[in-house]
Amino acid sequence: MDFSIFRYLIVGAGFFGSVLAERIANDRDEPVLVIEKRDHIGGNCYSQVDPETEIEYHRYGTHIFHTSKQKVWEYINRFTSFNGYRHQVLASYQNRVYQMPINLETINSFFGLNLRPFEVGDFLKSEVEKENITNPKSLEDKAVSLVGRKLYEAFIKGYTIKQWQKDPRELPASIIQRLPVRKNYDENYYFDQWQGIPSSGYSEIFKKMLNHRKIEFHLKTDFFVIKPYIPKSCHVIYSCC
C-alpha cells in the first residue's frame, strides 16, 4: 500500500472516523485513507441482517440516534431516513410496571399519591431528609441523598448491582452526580427533538459516507502493524478505543 498519496489517515471506521473522512473528502477535496481493525465498517453501530429471519439487528447492542441540533439532523439525513422511533422504558417492581426515568407518573403510582408538577420538588426533599445523608461516601448514599430510600431501593439499587456486579455500598459516590427525575408526565427516555433508528440500518449510513472517490478504506488492518510505513507528512487521526 502506498501511503504517500494520502494526506490523512483515519484509524477507525465508526461514526467519528467515517464522518471525518466524508467531511475531509468533500470539504477539502483531499485523499483520505480509513483503516479498520474489524471486518466491518460502522464501529459499535454496525448493523447486519440475520440470514435466518432476514431481520436487521445491531450486533453490539441497540443504538438510538437522537439530537436537538438541526445541523446534525440535516447532515445525517443526507445518508438515511429515520423511522421516528422514540425510546420509552418501563421498569417492573413487585409485579407492577412503572415508567422510567422516574417521572410524575412513576412517583404518583409508586406512592399512591396525586401530586402536581410543582409539588414534586418538596415531596422528594421530604423523602431525602428522612435519611439525613450530608456527606455521601458511596453510590448508595449519593443516590439516596438525591431521591430518597424508597425510590432508590425500587428502581436504582437492583439495576446498579446488575450493571456493576458490585454492591452499591462498595462503589464511590462520584459515579453519579445526579439522577434524572421529571416533574411532569414525559415518558420519553431522551429529551432531544429528533430521534429514531435508521430505516435502512446503520451500516448503510457508513457505506454512503465512505463512498467517495477521495476515500479509500481497508478492513482487518491493524494501525500498529502499518505505523512504521506511514510518512510524517500524513496526518493521523486515531478514533479507536
Predicted feature locations:
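Active-site/ligand-binding neighborhood in enzyme catalytic cores
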Residues: 96-98, 105-234
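Glycine-rich FAD pyrophosphate-binding loop
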Residues: 25-51
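Short hydrophobic core segments
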Residues: 9-11, 35, 232-241
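Conserved beta-strand segments of alpha/beta enzyme cores
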Residues: 31, 56, 81, 216-218
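Dinucleotide-binding Rossmann-like beta1-alpha1 core, especially the glycine-rich loop
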Residues: 53-129
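A short, basic/flexible loop-to-alpha-helix module at the beginning of a structural domain
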Residues: 1-4
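Long, positively charged, glycine-interspersed low-complexity recognition regions
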Residues: 6, 17, 216-218, 235-240
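N-terminal Rossmann-like FAD-binding beta1-loop-alpha1 element of flavoenzymes
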Residues: 6-34
